Amino acid sequence: MVMDIRVLTPDRVICSTTADEVILPGLTGQVGVLDGHATLITALDTGLLRIKLADKWTPIILCGGLAEIDRNRVTVLVNDVEELVAVELSEATKELEKATSAIENAETSKARLDASVELKKATARLEGINYLS
């Protein structure tokens, strides 16, 4: 069985498709969703959303939000998304190193928080590259 999934930002529809399986970046870990899942509303962290249809995974980087799951329908409301385009592995690795260094050298809690968000995005980019290659 397949389920419907919609990914929405405040200003546009990112995708509206069907899926065999969805993996969401929850605040306490990944949330796997299959057809017939119990009704659930969950907060999402910055991370990688994975949508599987016909043995093909599609990754999307989410920047926090909410997901509503109702048996065969998943609605993802996010602040923003980052599209994965042809990013070089070496470039993504450099971004991860830069974000790690920014956390280590942060002098204020705001700088540390901003750096941690960038670290989550950089980690999601690397995970996404693995799905694209």
UniProtKB/Swiss-Prot annotation:
<comment type="similarity">
    <text>Belongs to the ATPase epsilon chain family.</text>
</comment>
<dbReference type="InterPro" id="IPR020546">
    <property type="entry name" value="ATP_synth_F1_dsu/esu_N"/>
</dbReference>
<comment type="subunit">
    <text>F-type ATPases have 2 components, CF(1) - the catalytic core - and CF(0) - the membrane proton channel. CF(1) has five subunits: alpha(3), beta(3), gamma(1), delta(1), epsilon(1). CF(0) has three main subunits: a, b and c.</text>
</comment>
<keyword id="KW-0934">Plastid</keyword>
<dbReference type="GO" id="GO:0005524">
    <property type="term" value="F:ATP binding"/>
</dbReference>
<comment type="function">
    <text>Produces ATP from ADP in the presence of a proton gradient across the membrane.</text>
</comment>
<keyword id="KW-0472">Membrane</keyword>
<keyword id="KW-0375">Hydrogen ion transport</keyword>
<dbReference type="GO" id="GO:0009535">
    <property type="term" value="C:chloroplast thylakoid membrane"/>
</dbReference>
<dbReference type="InterPro" id="IPR036771">
    <property type="entry name" value="ATPsynth_dsu/esu_N"/>
</dbReference>
<dbReference type="GO" id="GO:0015986">
    <property type="term" value="P:proton motive force-driven ATP synthesis"/>
</dbReference>
<keyword id="KW-0813">Transport</keyword>
<dbReference type="GO" id="GO:0046933">
    <property type="term" value="F:proton-transporting ATP synthase activity, rotational mechanism"/>
</dbReference>
<dbReference type="InterPro" id="IPR001469">
    <property type="entry name" value="ATP_synth_F1_dsu/esu"/>
</dbReference>
<protein>
    <recommendedName>
        <fullName>ATP synthase epsilon chain, chloroplastic</fullName>
    </recommendedName>
</protein>
<keyword id="KW-0150">Chloroplast</keyword>
<keyword id="KW-0066">ATP synthesis</keyword>
<keyword id="KW-0406">Ion transport</keyword>
<dbReference type="Pfam" id="PF02823">
    <property type="entry name" value="ATP-synt_DE_N"/>
</dbReference>
<dbReference type="GO" id="GO:0045259">
    <property type="term" value="C:proton-transporting ATP synthase complex"/>
</dbReference>
<keyword id="KW-0139">CF(1)</keyword>
<keyword id="KW-0793">Thylakoid</keyword>
